[in-house]
Structure formats: structure tokens, C-alpha cells
């Protein structure tokens, strides 16, 4: 009986020591820029704004500059269109049928993504891109676009 009790105590201590450790935090030394093009009333955009942006801000803090572009705002339409077209022109093989849809996210110097199926996967992709690792498989509504001078290359 004592032996079983001893094994149980060791098991509980092992689980409490190793099972509850925090994930090692990534350390960033550079500042990255994420351009976020969205549409008002777009459910996927609203989900990303509500759930994705806070994850990115928590992970990167001051190391991620997020520039938000409301593609429905008539007052800034010229500025938004110029920024959007500049990105589109830097993409290899952009599908013109995707023009104007959101959310459209561009990690400057790395890659662009249209649509976000899962905000956690998107965050993992940002981290992977910056580390020079392979991106996750695109989700059901995700389209990856590769920049001519981007650090992420199509596999």
C-alpha cells in the first residue's frame, strides 16, 4: 500500500512540475509591419479584428506595427487604394478575382494572406514567417500570396 501511495505522490508531483509550465516566449529584436485591409460588415474581418489583432499585439507587443485600412471609408479611399495597389503590384501571380476582398493581411517583406480561417493558425504563420520556417497549410478560406522580394517563398 505504501508503495502505491509513493508512486501516486511521485506521479502528482511530476505532472504538476512539468505539465503546467509556461510556453517559452519568443523574443523579437526587430519591428515588423502588418498591413490589415478590412471591410465593415465582413464577418471574417470582424472576427479577425476582435480575436486576431489582440493575439498579435500580445505576442509581438511593440515589435509589430499594425496599419489598419478600412476599405469602405470614403474619406481615406485614395490612400487605402494606393496602399492596396502597391501591395498587389508586389505580389507574384495575384488573382484579380480576389481584388477588394478582406481581410487581407500583409506582413511587409514576408508574405500576404487573404482570409483567415483560424486566428491562432494565422499567428503561428506570422511567427513562422519571421523565423524563416514553413507556413501552416492554408485553411479553407485562406489564400497565401508571395511577394516578389518577400522572405517567404512558395513551397
Predicted regions and their residues:
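Non-catalytic, surface beta->alpha helical segment in thiol-disulfide oxidoreductase systems
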Residues: 99-144
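Thiol-based oxidoreductase modules, predominantly thioredoxin-like and allied folds used
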Residues: 61-81
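C-terminal motif of bacterial Sec signal peptides marking the signal peptidase cleavage site
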Residues: 16-19
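Short active-site neighborhood of thiol/selenol oxidoreductases, capturing the structured segment around
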Residues: 26-42
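Sec-dependent signal peptide recognition
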Residues: 3-10
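C-type cytochrome heme c attachment motif
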Residues: 40-47, 104
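Bacterial signal peptide processing site
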Residues: 21-23
